[in-house]
Regions:
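Conserved catalytic core of the tyrosine transesterase superfamily
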Residues: 1-157
Length: 157
C-alpha cells in the first residue's frame, strides 16, 4: 500500500499541483489509514472493503478527532481511491460509501467599537510609517478586506 500512497502523493504534487500543506496532510492521513489497515492484518488494497473504510472513520471519531480533521481524512481517502481506480489499480472506487461530517462554522471574534477605535488610533504620529499604518488599519476596519489582500495592495490600486 505504501508504494501506491507514494505514487498518489507524487501525482498530487506534480500533476494536480496541490499546495505543500495539502500534500503533506493527505500523506499523513493516508499513512494513518494504512497503519489502521495493517493493524487489521490488511496489507493489500484489494483486500480493503467499504466496511473497512467506514470502520476507519468510526475509529477516528472514537479517538475524538474534530469533524474538520475527519473530513480531511475522508477527502484524502476519496481522492486516493479515485486515483487508484482511474489508474486501474483497484477494480472499484469503494470510497463512495464515505461522507464527510458537518464541520461547525465558528463565527469570528469581533472587536467592540471602543477596541476598534483604540486600534485605529494606535499609530498617532505623523511620520510616513505611522501614517501608512493608520491608513492600513482604517482600510481594514472600513472595508473588511483580508490582511493578505491588504498587504498585497499597491499604491496604484
Amino acid at each position: 500500500m505504501e508504494q501506491y500512497i507514494e505514487a498518489f502523493i507524487m501525482y498530487l504534487h506534480n500533476v494536480k499541483k496541490t499546495s505543500d500543506n495539502t500534500t503533506m496532510s493527505y500523506k499523513r492521513d493516508l499513512y494513518k489509514w494504512m497503519d489502521y489497515m495493517k493493524s487489521l492484518g490488511i496489507d493489500s488494497l484489494g483486500d480493503v472493503t467499504k466496511e473497512h473504510l467506514t470502520d476507519f472513520v468510526a475509529y477516528l471519531e472514537s479517538k475524538k478527532f474534530k469533524a474538520a480533521t475527519i473530513s480531511r481524512n475522508i477527502a484524502a481517502m476519496k481522492a486516493f481511491y479515485h486515483y487508484m481506480y482511474k489508474e486501474k489499480i483497484v477494480k472499484e472506487d469503494i470510497s463512495d460509501v464515505l461522507h464527510a461530517p458537518k464541520v461547525e462554522k465558528k463565527l469570528p471574534d469581533v472587536l467592540s467599537m471602543e477596541e476598534a477605535i483604540r486600534l485605529v488610533e494606535q499609530p498617532s504620529g505623523d511620520t510616513p510609517k505611522e501614517l501608512r499604518d493608520r491608513a492600513m488599519l482604517e482600510l481594514l476596519y472600513a472595508t473588511g478586506i483580508r490582511v493578505s489582500e491588504l498587504v498585497g495592495l499597491k499604491t496604484s490600486d
